[in-house]
Amino acid sequence: MIQVQTVLNVADNTGAKKLMCIRILGSSFRRYASIGDIIVCSCKEAAPGGVVKKGDVVKAVVVRTKKEIGRPDGSYIKFDENAAVVIKDDKSPRGTRIFGPVARELREKDFMKIVSLAPEVL
């Protein structure tokens, strides 16, 4: 459950380290984002020499959340952190590597490039 003002870790090599959610894309009164949802973020912390600089406004997809999400088979999955991957307008990642596991729900939401780059899909 990501809402406005939530700070997320970045799970790719774009140079951004921390993102703060400033908008959840979807309907106009949407309050929470979960795994696979696209959010608009401001970069709050960045590594020198990266593609994304501090203060940049970027789109990102949520790949890990602390709040558990239910699956159709009755199981639940949750992670130790909130994390996102910076994406372009065509839903492809801006970085070339993904760090850490991602959820299987990204496959159903057509983020196949992120799923293929991830070291583990849970």
UniProtKB/Swiss-Prot annotation:
Segment forming the signal sequence: none
Gene Ontology molecular-function annotations: large ribosomal subunit rRNA binding; structural constituent of ribosome
Domain of life: Bacteria
Organism (species): Desulforudis audaxviator (strain MP104C)
HAMAP family registered for this protein in UniProt: Ribosomal_uL14
Name of the protein: Large ribosomal subunit protein uL14
Pfam families: Ribosomal_L14
Entry-linked CDD domains: Ribosomal_uL14
InterPro entries with a match to the protein in the record: Ribosomal_uL14 (IPR000218), Ribosomal_uL14_bac-type (IPR005745), Ribosomal_uL14_CS (IPR019972), Ribosomal_uL14_sf (IPR036853)
UniProt xrefs under Gene3D superfamilies: Ribosomal protein L14
Subunit note: Part of the 50S ribosomal subunit. Forms a cluster with proteins L3 and L19. In the 70S ribosome, L14 and L19 interact and together make contacts with the 16S rRNA in bridges B5 and B8.
Keywords assigned by UniProt, alphabetized: Ribonucleoprotein, Ribosomal protein, RNA-binding, rRNA-binding
Keyword rRNA-binding recorded: yes
Cellular component, GO, one term: cytosolic large ribosomal subunit
Family: Belongs to the universal ribosomal protein uL14 family.
GO term, biological process aspect, one: translation
Summary of the function given for this chain in its UniProt record: Binds to 23S rRNA. Forms part of two intersubunit bridges in the 70S ribosome.
